[in-house]
Regions:
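The alpha-helix within a helix-turn-helix
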Residues: 20, 32, 61
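Alpha-helix N-cap/N′ positions at the starts of helices
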Residues: 11-12, 37, 52
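Short, charged recognition helix plus adjacent turn
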Residues: 1-6, 62, 69-91
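Short alpha-helical DNA-recognition segment
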Residues: 23-47
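Short, basic-rich loop-to-helix N-cap that marks the start of a DNA-contacting helix
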Residues: 47-62, 78
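A short, Lys/Arg-rich alpha-helix, primarily the initiator
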Residues: 1-23
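Residues within the helices of the helix-turn-helix
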Residues: 17-18, 29, 58
Length: 91
């Protein structure tokens, strides 16, 4: 990725990438497909160059239990306990 590109949504992208790589262990193609999206759209969210869409966030909430507060704000209180603990214990 070109580091000179602005990444205004890098905080959101960090949480998405963590969940995809560390929790569900999928590549971008598989993860995007699992929530009904194509990889190019998902890739922009994870790159931090485009904001996660509401439809994308709702799909992630439905499929994986990720709370809106967690995805957009990093507030982990509403996550299922196993996800919350994993997020808090990450290195």
């Amino acid at each position: 990725m070109d580091d000179s590109k602005p990444r205004p949504y890098s905080d959101i992208s960090e949480r998405l990438k963590w969940h995809r790589e560390q929790i569900v262990e999928m590549n971008q193609e598989e993860y995007a497909k699992s929530i009904g999206f194509k990889r190019p759209a998902y890739s922009l969210w994870e790159a931090g160059t485009h904001r996660l869409s509401l439809d994308g966030a709702l799909a992630l909430r439905t499929k994986y239990g990720l709370s809106m507060d967690f995805m957009y704000e990093g507030i982990d209180d509403a996550l299922p306990m196993t996800l919350r603990n994993a997020w808090r214990e990450r290195s």
